[in-house]
């Protein structure tokens, strides 16, 4: 796949723009739809900041829907290709049974307390680091954790956007 440039995205009509970047926020193309009107973007970083601002400016209900669109970490259910790849890069698709049970317990405890799944940018993180973060963040207040989860969603989106676009050095890498 040819990576996109900021110029490609600035020239895109709304439909093409949403097709191109609508998946960077998990199951939430509304972020791209609302951000499209902010064109032109000075850079890919500028686009990512505009998308993060769209999330920040959304209603709390819309933000909660965005958080709830994310799968539980380590879950063995259907999820987007992006989530599968990210979780696999951290080894969450290969948890031994005892650790899988620990993750399920942490996920359930977290979701029961906060009303949304634990969210962390896990790409290339270790299972131990992720588990420790889950254990630590369960003690947060709901308001602190809500903001932490939104921040993590923006990190995930930035990493996904980076995969879709031309690197800072301008080289056109080809991806299978």
Swiss-Prot record:
Residues 72-96 are annotated as: Disordered. Pfam families: OHCU_decarbox. Disulfide bonds: none annotated. Keywords: Decarboxylase, Lyase, Oxidoreductase, Plasmid, Purine metabolism. This is 2-oxo-4-hydroxy-4-carboxy-5-ureidoimidazoline decarboxylase. Gene3D superfamilies: Oxo-4-hydroxy-4-carboxy-5-ureidoimidazoline decarboxylase. InterPro entries: OHCU_decarboxylase, OHCU_decarboxylase-1, OHCU_decarboxylase_sf. GO terms for molecular function: 2-oxo-4-hydroxy-4-carboxy-5-ureidoimidazoline decarboxylase activity; oxidoreductase activity. Substrate binds at residues 71, 83-87, 118-122. Pathway: Purine metabolism; urate degradation; (S)-allantoin from urate: step 3/3. The active site is at 70 (proton donor). PANTHER family: 2-OXO-4-HYDROXY-4-CARBOXY-5-UREIDOIMIDAZOLINE DECARBOXYLASE-RELATED. One of its GO terms (biological process) is allantoin metabolic process. It comes from the Archaea. Catalyzes the stereoselective decarboxylation of 2-oxo-4-hydroxy-4-carboxy-5-ureidoimidazoline (OHCU) to (S)-allantoin. It comes from Halalkalicoccus jeotgali (strain DSM 18796 / CECT 7217 / JCM 14584 / KCTC 4019 / B3). It catalyses: 5-hydroxy-2-oxo-4-ureido-2,5-dihydro-1H-imidazole-5-carboxylate + H(+) = (S)-allantoin + CO2. Its EC number is 4.1.1.97. Belongs to the OHCU decarboxylase family.
């Amino acid at each position: 796949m040819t990576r996109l440039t900021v110029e490609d995205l600035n020239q895109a009509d709304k439909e093409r723009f949403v097709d191109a970047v609508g998946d960077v926020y998990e199951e939430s193309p509304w972020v791209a739809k609302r951000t499209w009107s902010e064109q032109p973007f000075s850079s890919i970083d500028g686009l990512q900041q505009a998308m993060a601002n769209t999330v920040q400016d959304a209603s709390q209900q819309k933000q909660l829907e965005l958080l709830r669109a994310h799968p539980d970490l380590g879950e063995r259910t259907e999820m987007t290709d992006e989530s599968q790849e990210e979780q696999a890069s951290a080894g969450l698709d290969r948890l031994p049974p005892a650790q899988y049970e620990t993750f399920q317990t942490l996920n359930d405890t977290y979701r029961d307390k906060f009303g949304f799944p634990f969210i962390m940018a896990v790409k290339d993180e270790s299972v131990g680091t992720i588990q420790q973060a889950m254990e630590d963040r369960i003690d947060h207040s709901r308001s602190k954790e809500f903001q932490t989860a939104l921040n993590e969603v923006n990190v995930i989106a930035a990493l996904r956007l980076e995969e879709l676009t031309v690197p800072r050095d301008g080289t056109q890498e080809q991806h299978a």
